[in-house]
């Protein structure tokens, strides 16, 4: 009686690992689609603030969602401000005003000062 052929073990139910590269019919390997995220930048800031602290992938996902949400809110508000003033360009002034409108009190002040510092650093490096 012939032995049953051994195949690769089936992936566990609920396995989160995706197949890295799937084989196409013509033998070429398909590239994995790239997911854009802010995780690299969140990690860099975390290491500046707390060098000995790590972050879980779930927490990183939450931080990524948070940054995307704040970005969309600021961009939307800045767009509205530009439209109200019959402007077709969003400048740092619209962004600054949007931040002042969206963020509460002291948080807005700190965000504006950090933003101004970043813009100054960027323009001086050009």
From Swiss-Prot:
Modified residues annotated as ADP-ribosyl glutamic acid in this record: 3
Residues with the N6-lactoyllysine modification: 6, 12, 16-17, 21, 24, 44, 86, 109, 117, 121
Site of covalent link Glycyl lysine isopeptide (Lys-Gly) (interchain with G-Cter in ubiquitin): 35, 121
Keywords, in A-Z order: Acetylation, ADP-ribosylation, Chromosome, DNA-binding, Glycoprotein, Hydroxylation, Isopeptide bond, Methylation, Nucleosome core, Nucleus, Phosphoprotein, Ubl conjugation
Residue numbers carrying N6,N6,N6-trimethyllysine: 86
Residue positions, PTM Phosphoserine: 15, 37
Cross-link (Glycyl lysine isopeptide (Lys-Gly) (interchain with G-Cter in SUMO2)): 6, 21
N6-(beta-hydroxybutyryl)lysine carried by residues: 6, 12, 17, 21, 35, 86, 117, 121
Subcellular localization: Nucleus; Chromosome
Residues bearing the modification N6-butyryllysine: 6, 21
Residue positions where N6-malonyllysine is found in the record: 117
Subunit and interaction comment: The nucleosome is a histone octamer containing two molecules each of H2A, H2B, H3 and H4 assembled in one H3-H4 heterotetramer and two H2A-H2B heterodimers. The octamer wraps approximately 147 bp of DNA.
Protein name as catalogued: Histone H2B type 1-D
Organism listed in the record: Homo sapiens
Gene that this sequence comes from: H2BC5
């Amino acid at each position: 009686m012939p032995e049953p052929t051994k195949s690769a073990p089936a992936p566990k139910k609920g396995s989160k690992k995706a197949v890295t590269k799937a084989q196409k019919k013509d033998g070429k390997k398909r590239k994995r689609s790239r997911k854009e995220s802010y995780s690299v930048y969140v990690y860099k800031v975390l290491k500046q603030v707390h060098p000995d602290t790590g972050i879980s992938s779930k927490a990183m996902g939450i931080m990524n969602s948070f940054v995307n949400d704040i970005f969309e809110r600021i961009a939307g508000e800045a767009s509205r401000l530009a439209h109200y003033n019959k402007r077709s360009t969003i400048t740092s002034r619209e962004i600054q005003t949007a931040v002042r409108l969206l963020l509460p009190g002291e948080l807005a002040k700190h965000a504006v000062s950090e933003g101004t510092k970043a813009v100054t650093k960027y323009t001086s490096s050009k």
